[in-house]
Structure formats: structure tokens, C-alpha cells
Amino acid sequence: MIDLTLQRASTSAVPDSAAFRLWAEAALEKPHAEVVIRIVDREESAALNSTYRGKTGPTNVLSFPFVVPEGVPNDLLGDLVICAPVVEREAAEQGKPVEAHWAHMVVHGMLHLQGYDHIEEAEAEIMENREIAILRGLGMENPYREIRPE
């Protein structure tokens, strides 16, 4: 079960809270967790991307895992920041349904919060396979398959 807080700081149209909860719970690998998902605009995403990753411009999803001190019980998993305009643009560029791309970004971010990464090729393969399996369980296509816009 997930205790999800959804913050909407963007004027873009986004899926409803129930969809975010469904996607986050599908990727959750522990019995209970608290997560904040903040939906932002390009400016906030770019500022956070610069501050925390040293990269210029907005990005699709940023994850901020909460590091729990050893021996302290805590269900707080962390925060995800998703840039609505970037998700919409990427979905269009990749010829994917926008809702499927939203789901992918939530699943991707949730896996990051749980320690998955894609810096090394072997890690990336593990993470991508996990994403594909979770999204398949939600009735969605493989987000990494090549799709050409019509």
C-alpha cells in the first residue's frame, strides 16, 4: 500500500490521482511506503535539474530518495518530480500514448526511489526489464520498443 501525496504545480493537464496511485503501487516492492509526486513546469524542473544534477534544462523525472538512518523505522520512500510539458513532448516525439508515458515516468521514478539505477549497462538492463514487466502488468506496451510517429 502506498501513501501518496500528489502536488500539482503545473497548469498542464495530467492524469488523475487514482492513475498516479495505481502506477506507483504497481512499482512498489515493499509492503508500505510514503511518496510525494510533484508535477511541475519546465522552469521548476530546469532549476531542480541544475541544482541537483548539474544539468541544463528540464528533464522528465527526478527522484529524491529519502535516506533513512540505520535502525530508524520509517516508511518515507522519497519524492518524485515530473515535468508535465516534457512528458507530453516526449510522448508525442516517440509516438506513444501520453498516459502510457506518464505511467512509465512514475514507474521509472519509483524504481529509482527503491535503489534501481541505469548508469551501468548491466544495471540499466535490470531496471528496464523491471519497468517493462510492471507496465505489462498494467496492460501497457514496452516503453523501450521502437515506435515511429505516423
From Swiss-Prot:
Gene3D superfamilies for this protein: Metalloproteases ('zincins'), catalytic domain (3.40.390.30)
Keywords noted in UniProt: Cytoplasm, Endonuclease, Hydrolase, Metal-binding, Nuclease, Ribosome biogenesis, rRNA processing, Zinc
Main location as per UniProt: cytoplasm
Membrane-spanning residues: none
Free-text cofactor note: Binds 1 zinc ion.
Enzyme nomenclature, EC number: 3.1.-.-
Enzyme class: hydrolase
GO cellular component: cytoplasm
InterPro entries: MetalPrtase_cat_dom_sf_prd (IPR023091), YbeY (IPR002036), YbeY_CS (IPR020549)
GO molecular function, one term: RNA endonuclease activity
Binding-site residues for Zn(2+), renumbered to this chain: 108, 112, 118
Protein localization: Cytoplasm
Names of the cofactor(s): Zn(2+)
Entry-linked Pfam families: YbeY (PF02130)
A single BP term in Gene Ontology: rRNA processing
Job of this protein: Single strand-specific metallo-endoribonuclease involved in late-stage 70S ribosome quality control and in maturation of the 3' terminus of the 16S rRNA.
Family stated for the protein in its record: Belongs to the endoribonuclease YbeY family.
Protein name: Endoribonuclease YbeY
Source organism per UniProt: Methylococcus capsulatus (strain ATCC 33009 / NCIMB 11132 / Bath)
Gene name linked to the record: ybeY
